């Protein structure tokens, strides 16, 4: 059944291929006096997952659900409102299928700091207690008020940061993946550098990516303004805001690098190229100070 649970199939395809006959026979050998864990980190409402939970319940297995406040696929920061909708939906299914509770994992290869994961863990507490209660939007506003003394609008910078994180993941990558959860894939390759003998070619090659850079640069400025407002208005948990601030600088670094590489590729003579190289050097050197401040804040 594994392939039915982890492939993008239609409901009709799932129903057509669903077959538990081997499991129905093997269940006779399953131990009874234990708790079985049902790990599912993404959307728990997919039909295959719901059918499996019903199979557990039908066969009288003691099952505990396990969702995630952070996974290895999202370095430095969870995404999608701290995964609150996934958590809420799984908690509701736990109630409907009479499972023996639910926990939320938080993988440290996904986020280097507890503060970036905490909102997801609070969502787990919220929805495991009352899955039919607040909507995710209502939860996000309540979290802002109770954890920081801020309005939902004053915490909108965090939604923008989660969006920025997606570009950060692949900003400098053209194929494969580099991920702390499972290492570097064999197909991993970074983008090429501009060729001074072929000005403009690099820009044409990566035009789509550079268009996104301009969007992300504007997003960075928006996040900075939002963080400044939050820092001025917050009544508590200011350290969490410090963590967000440094994480925002990290997410912005590849944007700055791509911007100066585009400048270099657009130069028309040696003097302009030398000036562009100085700017590239400044950005590269700034990584050390950015990293030092990042590590100081995180530690």
Enumerate the language-model features and the residues they cover.
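Substrate-binding groove of N-acetylhexosamine-processing glycoside hydrolases
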Residues: 1-299
């Amino acid at each position: 059944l594994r392939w039915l649970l982890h492939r993008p199939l239609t409901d009709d395809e799932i129903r057509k291929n669903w077959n538990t006959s081997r499991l129905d026979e093997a269940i006779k050998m399953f131990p009874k006096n234990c708790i079985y864990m049902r790990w599912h980190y993404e959307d728990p409402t997919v039909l295959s997952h719901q059918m499996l939970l019903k199979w557990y319940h039908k066969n009288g297995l003691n099952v505990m659900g396990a969702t995630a406040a952070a996974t290895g696929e999202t370095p430095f920061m969870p995404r999608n409102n701290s995964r609150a909708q996934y958590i809420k939906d799984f908690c509701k299914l736990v109630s409907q299928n009479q499972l023996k509770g639910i926990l939320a994992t938080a993988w440290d290869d996904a986020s280097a700091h507890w503060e970036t994961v905490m909102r997801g863990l609070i969502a787990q507490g919220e929805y495991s207690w009352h899955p039919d209660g607040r909507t995710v939007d209502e939860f996000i506003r309540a979290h802002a008020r109770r954890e920081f003394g801020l309005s939902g609008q004053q915490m909108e910078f965090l939604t923008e940061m989660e969006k920025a994180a997606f570009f950060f993941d692949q900003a400098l990558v053209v194929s494969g993946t580099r991920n702390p959860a499972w290492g570097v894939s064999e197909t991993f390759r970074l983008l090429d550098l501009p060729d001074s003998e072929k000005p403009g070619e690099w820009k044409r090659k990566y035009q789509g990516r550079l268009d996104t850079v301009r969007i992300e640069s504007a997003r960075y400025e928006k996040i900075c303004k939002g963080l400044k407002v939050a820092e001025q208005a917050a009544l508590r948990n200011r350290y969490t805001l410090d963590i967000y601030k440094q994480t925002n600088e990290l997410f912005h670094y590849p944007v700055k690098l791509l911007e100066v590489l585009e400048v270099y590729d657009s130069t028309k003579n040696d003097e302009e190229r030398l000036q562009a190289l100085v700017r590239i050097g400044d950005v590269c050197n700034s990584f050390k100070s950015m990293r030092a401040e990042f590590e100081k804040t995180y530690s």
